[in-house]
């Protein structure tokens, strides 16, 4: 019996343990399943969250782009609207300015009309007063009045007669002047070669070029530094070229190089030595050139320093014309014209020879060559009438004597002589174009032509709007503007042409 009880209790205990084990297993599995479900749910929640964030960012980006596009469109519309407003304001401003101009013109017309009305009223009053006065005049008073009116009426005819007589006298004077100038030119016919800005030096062989250049170019650098002249060595056989706008420096450099080539020893110290010798030779040549110039011009008794300065003019040019030859030419021409007119030929030659003496040192001193020349002449004992010739040949002073006028005329004649002076083609063309532009800038000018190598400008005007008096004034105004705005050698002639053509046909 007890055994059955124990067996039953044991069976119950075993059954309880088995049931408890099974329950624990189910609980553990349920927990694991619950954890798995939680982890899966969290994972899905994270993925949904990330997706939502990405979609949100994309939506924000899309909205931002749409906003930027809309903002740009609005700004463009606003800019276009502002431009339309500005254009409208400019249009209104122009209209306002035009309106003000029209109002100003109307005011001027109104003022002119009122002025005319006042003049008419004054004339009416004068006529009324004149009629009242005439009613009580004597015969003699009426006669005087008629004569006064006749004088006023024919005053224009008298002025025209005066003009014709003046033109006739000027024509006779011009003919006589041309005879004197032609006589002087016939007596003086110089041979002249245009000056250039380069000199050539012949070499015994092309090997000498390397010696002139020197090691690493030291000889040529020293030569150019000392002389101030460009030494050009090219492929031309047995020749080198010296280039410089200053003829004096170029001549000293030429003699220096010839001495170096003849000696054969070329190095910096030798270059300096030969340069000093060349300077001494040129100084001697300058003195001889001055003495020869005084002899050719027939001028005696000049101060030695003036003779030396004259020699320096041999190495100066003006528009390609040698200044010393030009001075001799002016002296002879002035002397010939003075002799023809019965004036002092010696004084004219002296003034003509010294008229450009200032150009010998105008690169070293401040001032115009005429002012410098007058100061030099005064310093070395020349008389005041000679000094006046120097100052007056370019108009800085009024000429005091007839000989001073002849010196100025001879200077212009020498400069204007064909072939005496030259310019480069480019400067020549620019000067002619500028000359025609100046003439065409005046009112009533139809055409303008520069002729005679730019020494004459012919201006064709509108005949219906320009009378003889206005034509003379126009020629004067054009000549003054040319003097102010244009540089040119010699004298430039301005001719105003007024041509009126009337055509009729006989049938």
Curated annotation (Swiss-Prot):
GO molecular function, one term: RNA binding
A Gene Ontology cellular-component term: plasma membrane
HAMAP family associated with the record: RNase_Y (MF_00335)
Organism expressing this protein natively: Thermotoga petrophila (strain ATCC BAA-488 / DSM 13995 / JCM 10881 / RKU-1)
A Pfam entry, by short name: KH_1
Keyword Protease assigned: no
Protein topology in the membrane: Single-pass membrane protein
Domain of life: Bacteria
Listed name of the protein: Ribonuclease Y
């Amino acid at each position: 019996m007890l055994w059955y009880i124990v067996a039953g209790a044991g069976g119950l205990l075993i059954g309880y343990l088995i049931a408890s084990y099974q329950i624990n297993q189910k609980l553990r599995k349920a927990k694991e399943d619950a954890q798995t479900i939680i982890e899966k749910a969290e994972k899905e929640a994270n993925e949904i969250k990330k997706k939502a964030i990405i979609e949100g960012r994309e939506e924000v980006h899309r909205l931002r782009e749409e906003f930027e596009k809309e903002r740009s469109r609005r700004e463009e519309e606003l800019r276009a609207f502002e431009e339309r407003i500005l254009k409208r304001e400019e249009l209104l401003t122009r209209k306002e300015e035009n309106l003000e101009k029209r109002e100003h013109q109307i005011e001027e017309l109104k003022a002119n009309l009122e002025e005319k009305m006042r003049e008419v009223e004054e004339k009416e009053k004068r006529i009324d007063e004149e009629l009242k006065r005439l009613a009580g005049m004597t015969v003699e008073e009426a006669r005087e009045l008629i004569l006064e009116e006749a004088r006023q009426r024919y005053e224009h005819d008298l002025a025209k007669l005066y003009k014709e007589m003046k033109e006739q006298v000027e024509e006779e004077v011009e003919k006589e002047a041309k005879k004197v100038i032609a006589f002087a030119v016939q007596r003086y016919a110089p041979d002249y070669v245009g000056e250039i800005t380069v000199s050539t030096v012949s070499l015994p062989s092309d090997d000498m070029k390397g010696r002139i250049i020197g090691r690493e170019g030291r000889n040529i650098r020293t030569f150019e530094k000392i002389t101030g002249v460009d030494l050009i060595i090219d492929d031309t056989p047995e020749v080198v070229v010296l280039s410089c706008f200053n003829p004096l420096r170029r001549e000293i450099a030429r003699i220096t190089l010839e001495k170096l080539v003849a000696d054969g020893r070329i190095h910096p110290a030798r270059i300096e030595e030969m340069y000093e010798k060349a300077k001494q030779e040129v100084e001697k040549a300058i003195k001889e050139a001055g003495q020869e110039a005084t002899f050719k011009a027939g001028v005696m008794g000049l101060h030695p320093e003036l003779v030396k300065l004259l020699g320096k003019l041999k190495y100066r040019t003006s528009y390609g014309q040698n200044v010393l030859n030009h001075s001799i030419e002016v002296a002879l021409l002035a002397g010939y014209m003075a002799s023809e007119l019965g004036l002092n030929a010696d004084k004219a030659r002296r003034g003509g020879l010294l008229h450009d003496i200032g150009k010998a040192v105008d690169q070293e001193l401040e001032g115009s060559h005429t002012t410098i020349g007058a100061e030099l002449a005064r310093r070395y004992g020349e008389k005041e009438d000679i000094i006046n010739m120097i100052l007056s040949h370019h108009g800085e002073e009024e000429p005091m004597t007839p000989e001073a006028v002849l010196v100025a005329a001879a200077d212009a004649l020498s400069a204007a002589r064909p072939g005496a002076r030259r310019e480069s083609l480019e400067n020549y063309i620019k000067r002619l174009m500028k000359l025609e532009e100046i003439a065409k800038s005046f009112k009533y000018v139809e055409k303008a032509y520069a002729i005679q190598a730019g020494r004459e400008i012919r201006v064709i005007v509108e005949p219906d709007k320009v009378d003889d008096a206005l034509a003379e004034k126009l020629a004067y105004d054009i000549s003054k503007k040319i003097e102010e705005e244009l540089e040119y050698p010699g004298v430039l002639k301005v001719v105003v042409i007024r041509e009126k053509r009337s055509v009729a046909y006989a049938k």
